[in-house]
Design a protein with these regions (language model features):
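Short, cysteine/histidine-rich loop/knuckle motifs that typically chelate Zn2+
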Residues: 188-193, 212-214
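Intrinsically disordered, low-complexity regulatory regions of eukaryotic proteins
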Residues: 163, 230-231
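Cysteine-rich micro-motifs
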Residues: 205-216
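Conserved binding/catalytic microenvironments
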Residues: 200-201
Length: 231
């Protein structure tokens, strides 16, 4: 399974976003979730799973080729899983550090991210329900045959996504710090008009933006204009 995809907004802008985990990539294939506490604005993402064929294509590209195409009901089920993962991600991701000093403290392990909320039991149940299904079996490359080749069902692919979500949220938890005391690797984009959630796999845990192409560059432009105005 690989991560990263081109996403777009309802307004038509598009950029490449690697959320760092396949479950988070799946969560960002449309809409995304409101922050019920009102801390962050909603990110209005365009719908990437508009049809059963879109779902087949996405899962085939990110897991294994799907043997039998999705039905309309399976598309609804997949969107329900997506919404549950998105809400859990918003609940688990702390508000981004707003100052350089806070970012340094978080990276050094001196400050845990704040602003998490309690997850909804129904969302946890949804992820667990899909994760309980058989997932895509691993296979060792290099052989001439592969057991189960061309027999990956849509339910298996969704189970793989759900299991990744389960592993992710077990790792990061929903408290202010992880079980081992380290700051969480789950972060929100620091842009005020974004709020997308990603898993920060950088060595120092200092990733700030959903994408440098979009929010990172826009922040640089704003900072440059502010410096020019102050001169």
């Amino acid at each position: 399974m690989h991560t990263g995809q081109h996403i777009r907004t309802d307004a038509g802008s598009s950029w490449f976003f690697d959320a760092g985990r396949i479950a988070l990539d799946f969560a960002h294939t449309g809409g995304f979730a409101d922050d019920s506490a009102g801390r962050r604005p909603r990110s209005q993402l365009g719908e990437l799973l508009a049809s059963p064929a879109d779902l087949d294509e996405w899962l085939s590209e990110h897991t294994e080729p799907i043997d039998v195409g999705a039905s309309g009901r399976e598309l609804q089920d997949a969107r329900a899983l997506r919404a549950a993962i998105a809400r859990l991600a918003v609940a688990a991701a702390p508000a981004p550090a707003s100052t350089a000093a806070e970012r340094t403290a978080v990276a050094a392990g001196l400050r845990a991210g704040a602003g998490r909320t309690r997850p909804a039991p129904d969302d946890i149940d949804t992820v667990n329900l899909f994760a309980a299904l058989p997932d895509v079996p691993p296979s060792l490359p290099g052989g001439r045959r592969r057991a189960g080749a061309n027999r990956v069902r849509l339910a298996q692919a969704l189970s793989s996504v759900a299991r990744d979500a389960g592993a992710l949220f077990t790792e990061v938890g929903f408290d202010d710090v992880e079980a081992d005391g380290r700051p969480t690797r789950l972060s929100r984009c620091s842009a005020e008009d974004c709020g997308l959630v990603f898993y920060d796999s950088s060595r120092g845990g200092t990733r700030r933006w959903c994408s440098m192409q979009r929010c990172g560059n826009r922040a640089k432009v704003r900072a440059h204009r502010a410096r020019r105005a102050a001169e």
